[in-house]
């Protein structure tokens, strides 16, 4: 596993009063510890975002929902040409700056949204209850991005603001592969996922679907109970 001795975990190194049940050890643990352990396992041990497609030398990578930078940190030894990291949380962004002070990393303190405006949100780590939002199309234009080799997405429901009519030409023709977490935890997200699945997902050449524990669930993607059963899934998409 990659050496993490110099990696700054920010708020995740500070004990939180809030706890969460960890099924692996069958007891409640502090939220910061749970979140840190989950990230280490997902990104540095299981490498969930690179299970099927991998970042290669010279790639242009976009990391949407960069947090404190674990995914980008995990791929830097592959020498990507450029990594664009978006993170809306002000507290996590400060740590992101500490972890990724590299010439081939572009850090952006924004989150993907339906509009270029300030967005109220309950899903930001830290004390923030709003963030600076940007449309995916605006992000592409503002950063002069012509092509993305590897698009990684984990933005707490913001993924549905990426897969929109205005972005589909770019996503289908100017992105090599897309890997991310799709959230179905609320009723509104379940509605959005169904729309995304039935209208946009079928337009891509190759699609693989995994549960959060790595099980292949593509076979049941269009089953009646899929959307009701799952709260979160990992989708791997390729245009190649």
Functional labels for PLM-detected ranges:
Residues 1-240:
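Phosphate/nucleotide-binding beta-alpha loop and adjacent structural elements of enzyme active sites
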């Amino acid at each position: 596993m990659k050496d993490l001795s110099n990696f700054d975990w920010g708020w995740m190194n500070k004990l939180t009063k809030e706890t969460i049940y960890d099924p692996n050890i069958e007891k409640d643990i502090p939220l910061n510890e749970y979140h840190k352990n989950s990230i280490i396992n997902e990104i540095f041990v299981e490498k969930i975002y690179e299970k099927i497609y991998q970042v290669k030398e010279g790639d242009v990578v976009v990391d949407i929902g960069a947090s404190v930078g674990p995914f980008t940190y995990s791929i830097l030894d592959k020498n990507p040409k450029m990594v664009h990291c978006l993170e809306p949380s002000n507290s996590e962004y400060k740590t992101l700056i500490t972890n990724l002070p590299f010439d081939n990393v572009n850090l952006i303190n924004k989150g993907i949204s339906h509009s270029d405006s300030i967005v109220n949100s309950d899903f930001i780590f830290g004390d923030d209850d709003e963030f600076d939002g940007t449309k995916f199309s605006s992000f592409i234009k503002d950063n002069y991005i012509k092509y993305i080799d590897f698009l990684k997405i984990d933005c707490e429901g913001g993924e549905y603001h990426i897969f929109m009519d205005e972005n589909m030409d770019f996503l289908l023709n100017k992105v090599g592969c897309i890997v991310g977490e799709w959230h179905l935890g609320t009723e509104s997200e379940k509605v959005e996922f169904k729309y995304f699945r039935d209208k946009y997902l079928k337009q891509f050449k190759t699609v693989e679907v995994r549960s959060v524990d790595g099980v292949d669930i593509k076979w049941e993607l269009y089953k009646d109970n899929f959307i009701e059963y799952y709260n979160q899934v990992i989708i791997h998409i390729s245009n190649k």
